[in-house]
């Protein structure tokens, strides 16, 4: 069960990178990049931080560099920082999309955007609370923090759209939550 839980992180993390190259590279390149990235970037960093490696609380850095410790409860470093760095590098290498920013393409189906955002919101409960590895108070606090964070982001995005455009949008609310 723990292995499958960890594999969901490994499978979902490349999805965060997709926005940097969507519609600009071929599907075979996506599969090739994803496989290489998981093996050579994600897996080593997950081990270094979560698996007792040199950046973990039990590793070399903690024992050698007094006061140095790494705490990554649910993937801030392993998932988000790694994906962000990869996305920035890919975006820089590929350059801007054709027609951007003069041609902005709105989403084709706002209903599906909202369903996807809702699925992500619920999925975060599993990732964040599941990282406690127990159904206890820490997991409950993780779920509460997850919900409050996403809800606050929605409200802030609504306010920003209202100030900027005079009315909020469904896609904007979903974007804020994500």
Task: State where each predicted segment sits.
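Hydrophobic alpha-helical transmembrane bundles of multi-pass membrane proteins
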Residues: 1-178
């Amino acid at each position: 069960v723990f292995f499958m839980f960890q594999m969901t992180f490994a499978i979902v993390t490349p999805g965060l990178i997709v926005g940097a190259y969507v519609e600009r590279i071929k599907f075979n390149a996506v599969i090739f990049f994803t496989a290489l990235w998981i093996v050579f970037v994600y897996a080593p960093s997950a081990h270094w931080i979560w698996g007792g490696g040199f950046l973990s609380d039990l590793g070399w850095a903690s024992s050698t560099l007094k006061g140095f410790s790494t705490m990554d409860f649910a993937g801030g470093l392993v998932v988000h920082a790694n994906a962000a760095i990869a996305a920035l590098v890919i975006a820089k290498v590929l350059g801007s999309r054709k027609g951007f920013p003069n041609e902005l393409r709105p989403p084709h189906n706002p209903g599906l955007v909202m369903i996807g955002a809702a699925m992500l919101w619920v999925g975060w409960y599993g990732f964040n609370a599941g990282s406690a590895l127990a159904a206890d108070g820490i997991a409950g606090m993780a779920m509460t923090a997850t919900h409050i964070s996403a809800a606050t982001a929605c409200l802030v995005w609504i306010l920003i759209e209202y100030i900027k455009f005079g009315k909020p949008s469904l896609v904007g609310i979903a974007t804020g939550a994500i």
